[in-house]
Amino acid sequence: MADKRTEILRAARPILLRDGLGGTTLDRVAAEGGISKMTLYRHFPSKEALFTGLGGYMCECTREGLERAPSADIKKSPANRLADELRVLTSALIEPDWLALYRLLVADGWRFPDLARVFDQSGMRIVRRRIAELLEAGGVAADDSGQVAGEVVALALGDGYQRAILGIVEEGDDVAFAQQIEAAVTHGFSQI
């Protein structure tokens, strides 16, 4: 059974992602989420704290998904493991909830540096580290793997992610992501 904090975040998630920070109040989260105000305020004294908590929670859920990804199969080659990792990552980041969170982060993150920091430290920094480890397993020098990992992530997300953020969905996007991932893997291991 989930702890109370997780229950609150699950209840608040659709409200915050639908209405954003400006359109959300803690009172409405309590009412729509079926949570007592006292419990909500005990765990999250402000909507900014709730938003930051939600960002951390979503990053944690995505990390758990990556840990169960086929890339964990050490019998596969590092290149295949990297491709698997990038497929899971791109699939997660183009989910509607992640796109909504990212849009909110871009719109409001500058006012809430803690949220931006959580997203970076609990999300993308960990992803880059995991990818750097896969690159190192394939022969990329440890001194270079961090930089190359950032490049690999950027290439894998590419134009497809930018279109998804803007709400542009086109036939063939899945093929475009597959091509971007292939190019990212090729780039990553060309740095040996």
What are these regions (language model features)?
Residues Y57-K76, A164-F177:
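Short, flexible, glycine-rich and Lys/Arg-enriched loop motifs at helix boundaries
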Residues E136-A184:
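Hydrophobic/aromatic-rich alpha-helical bundle segments in the mid-to-C-terminal region
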Residues S46, D108-P113, G158:
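Short loop-to-helix capping motifs
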Residues I15, L134, Q180-I192:
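C-terminal alpha-helix
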